[in-house]
Amino acid sequence: MQESRFIQKKRVLVTGGAGFIGSLLCDRLLAAGHKVICLDNFFTGTRENIQPLLDNINFELIRHDITFPIFLEVDRVFNLACPASPIHYQYNPIKTLKTNILGTLNMLGLAKRVKARILHASTSEVYGDPHVHPQTEDYWGNVNPIGIRSCYDEGKRAAETLMMDYKREQNVDSKIIRIFNTYGPNMRADDGRVVSNFIVQALTGQDITIYGDGRQTRSFCYVDDLVDVMLRMMEKDNFCGPVNTGNPDEFTILELAEKVVAMTGSKSKLVFKPLPQDDPTQRRPDISLAKKELGWEPKVNLKAGLEKTIPYFENWLAHNTKEVKS
């Protein structure tokens, strides 16, 4: 991060601040001396994620759903609120759409009123099942608008449109990042994402569930690297994005499963199930723009990131064994 640009202390709003990425972003902002307001409705966020922050005098927690307006005085808005794993956003697709559209509208309205800079956390899902590889920001994507994932994919695309329209028409200082697969501490064990699934299954001796033949690819970014680029993007003047934020190292799902099994010493077997509808076959970011405009590229490779993530889940399982299905 351009630390010198962020020395002036600010009031920072983080929507979805009790979630996986949001909680770690709040922690980093507090460490830099900022006043942080964490907004979360606790649909997927957890109090456990922010428990260590509650005694900090610069931290304020507000239980609130951003589909309803809120009036606050802030300098910066990180808009992260939205369920981000298929198991959660498909559970309530209409709510997911409302969060992306009404929630983003409300945060843009707030940013306009108080003249705050706002950064929207979009997603690689705006590219759908891409025909271009790796994906660059000028690729418009290949999204099924009526599929079971569309509440998230199209919701995020609509939110990007709102961000750009408010910038063009209302002069709101808005920014967009497109987050690719991210993992690390504070992930939920039950969120259905591939890294958390594989680690929990391996640590508990369950079969490792691979959907499809395992040859589909993903790129995995460790969460500390993501928080770094979010902070850089927020403080970068005269650049609104969108910009890809992810690790360009590409792995097959089968390679990930084998790596997790080896690193945990698990005796779990690999089992294969049908690939879900609209599940992308390839996903890898081109981060040339992030390198050029933000001077950023990820530092943590997959092995090093897993070495930090596996102990988190070991500790979580030691205290939450009843919540894990056998």
Set out the residue ranges of the language-model regions.
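C-terminal substrate-binding subdomain of Rossmann-fold SDR/epimerase-dehydratase oxidoreductases
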Residues: 1-6, 25, 64, 106, ...
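N-terminal Rossmann-like NAD(P)+-binding domain of SDR-like oxidoreductases, especially those catalyzing
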Residues: 1-182, 224, 300, 308, ...
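Short, solvent-exposed loop/turn segments at secondary-structure boundaries
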Residues: 91-92, 186-191
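Nucleotide-sugar-dependent glycosyltransferase donor-binding/catalytic pocket residues
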Residues: 97, 187-188, 219-222
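A glycine/serine/threonine-rich, flexible loop-to-helix segment
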Residues: 133, 189-197
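Conserved donor sugar-nucleotide recognition element shared by glycan-biosynthetic enzymes
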Residues: 151, 159, 191, 253, ...
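Hydrophobic alpha-helix immediately C-terminal to the catalytic Tyr-X-X-X-Lys motif of short-chain
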Residues: 158, 162, 166, 198, ...
